[in-house]
Amino acid sequence: MKKVMTMILVFAVMAGGCATSGERSAGDRIESGVRAAATIGTYEALTERPDWAVAFDTARQELIEIAAADRIDFYLVYGIVNRLPVNELKSDRAVVYITAATLLLEEAGRPSVDLERPGALRPAVIGLITGIEQGMLLAGVREE
């Protein structure tokens, strides 16, 4: 799961677009891909370990604060994701998520992203927030 969340972040950075009319669709693709992977990953983790709900909710709250900022720091987002206690998961299904994240990365075509551009990571952060929320709802550890 930790590898999946890390791959999601890598995907988000590499799939960012340039400041053209296509940026909106690239942002939408990033957000929806990250959201889907985060939903599945969160659900998988919390189904196996519902006691991790507090850690996921804390990460979600921190990501909400980051999303509201003018500038989003990749390393801060990366640190939040890597603090999640998912390295203890024993599920073989995690391989499916890693493969899915890799396919999303390849689909993005690996365009470069300017880490200094304030909004470059925003779609990924929004996708992470929404995905964590949806995964928590599906796992039954959070109410709407």
Question: What kind of feature is each model-predicted range?
Answer:
Residues 4-14:
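Sec-dependent N-terminal signal peptides
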Residues 13, 17-144:
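Cationic, hydrophobic amphipathic alpha-helical membrane-interacting segments
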